[in-house]
Structure formats: C-alpha cells, structure tokens
Amino acid sequence: FASPILQRLSEARTPDHRLRALILTPTRELAIQIGESFEAYGKYLSLRHAVIFGGVGQNPQVEALNRGVDILVATPGRLMDLHDQGFVHLEQLEIFVLDEADRMLDMGFIHDVTRILDKIPSRENLGMFSATISREVMDIAWVYQRDAAEITVREDEQNKPDIKQFRMDVPHDGKADAIEKILNETGFDRCMAFCNTKGSTERITKFLQMRGIDAECIHGDIPQRKREQVMEKFRRGELRVFVSTDVAARGIDVDDVDIVFNCDVPDENQDYVHRIGRTGRARRQGVAVTFISDYPAKMRIDDIAQKTRNEIVPVKFDEDGRLTTA
C-alpha cells in the first residue's frame, strides 16, 4: 500500500505537511519495517513521514510531528497517547490503513482501533490488510467502511510457496535438543524458532547457545533497542537461529529462511500460517517442523492440518539419530 499512497499524496501536495495518511500496525517491529518502505519508495519525493511506537522516549517522535508529516506509521497505544496530548491531529486525514488487522484485535487493541476510526472525518479511503481475515475484522469493516469491496488475492499453483511441513513427537524438555540434531543433519544456516511464551524462548535460546549455536531471542520483555539489534543481526546472517514469540517477530522480513521450528503448536490456525510463511520465499523450498509434546498439541496440529488443508508429515529420529518418516 505504500506505493499508491505516495503516488496519490504526491499528486496533491500541501505546503504545510499536514497529516493525510495514517498506517496503524500492531507491533513496533512492523511499524519500523513499514517506515523503511516509505523511506525507500518516497526517497525522491518531498513528502514527509514519521514512525511512532511505545517502549522508547516520545520526545524525538513529538519533534518529528511538530515539523509536519504527510504520512504517519504508528502503533495504537502511542498514537492515542500523543493524540490525547494534542500532538497528532486527524481532522484532515484522507487515507487510513489498518495493517495486520486480525493481529490488532487479537492483541486487545479493538478499543483503540474503534476510537481512532470514530475520529476520522472521511472513510472513503479506509483499507484493511491482513494475511487472514477474522469475523471480528469483517464486523469492523461493515460498521466503518462505506460500500467496501472485499479483495482476496489467491495463490496460483505456479507461485504457491514450496514448504515441506513435518510434525515430530518431542518431550517438553527435548525441543532444543531436537533443533540441534536437525541442524546438524541438514546443515541449515538461517532458522527461525517460534514459542508461545517468553520463558520458552529464553530456555531454548540458552540451551542452543550452550551447544555453541549462534542463537538469540526476542520477546515483549526485551528492550526495544536490544530487539532491533537482534533482528538486524539475523537479517545480516550473523545468527543461525532466531527465537521469538509470534507478536515480537512481526516485522521480520527475511527471504532466505531455511527452516521454521514451531517449538509450541500455536493457539490460532492463522498463527501457524504466519509462522511457516517465513520460509519458502523467493521461489526457494522451505521446511517447517512442529514439535508435539502432549495430547492437546496433537489435537491442535490435527485441526490445523484439516482447516488449512496442509499435509503435515510425521517424522522421527531413527536409532542412528537420522530423520525418517514415522
């Protein structure tokens, strides 16, 4: 959406750089990524943009707003905070994009989202984008959008990601060991591991580091600056394993991830789709392995396989420690 927004705003520039386009996103990492896209695509335009999010001091963000911005990328909490302080003005907003709409609601931002929507004077250019659209998102669309058109992009077989999906029975305390064995056998260099809890990310990362594997993790309790440093190391290829929770990983855009490990089965089917979609990009073959540690996890992965229509092949380690079909 960045390119058409830049094109439209550049065709009718305003000298005072008033806020005309707002992009709302659930996480700091994704906000930064979107801001980088506007920076790259709008390099030779006279439009200004700013990125605001919580977890850091607001003074630099306020200074950018006071200088005037045409485009604002924001997370809900910091946006409402600065709006309530009088630093963000939505009266002349022309374009509003709600990115990762489903995740926004899952994270409990529904109240902030509706407050923002209520303050927008015109909803003729209101767009919602998400890899998966929940019923709650559609409810918002029907209430706030005028004569909305629903556009679904279908994957054709030629461009469908080639991701081999596997499932493996692994005890709770054996997940990091399983990752190490798979890495030793496959030689994969760039890997992502997803956990459902912050504690799990810490434990698995510590184990991998003890085994001499370059691994680091991010989650919601890690300071923003540290999270950005870890993500940049992964982008540069300096980490072999990047461990994260679902929310913290939003905004990571790396095309050559060899394998995705689901250390815990995600609670939502859409999270499974988001996770494995990190691999198999740019016409490369990807691999996703999900660890099953108890009966509820088995039931969840069975439901995911059925609902997403994916074949998830059972695998195990044989007596020699090699991977084989179960």
Q: Where are the language model's segments positioned?
A:
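Conserved helicase RecA-like core
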Residues: 1-326
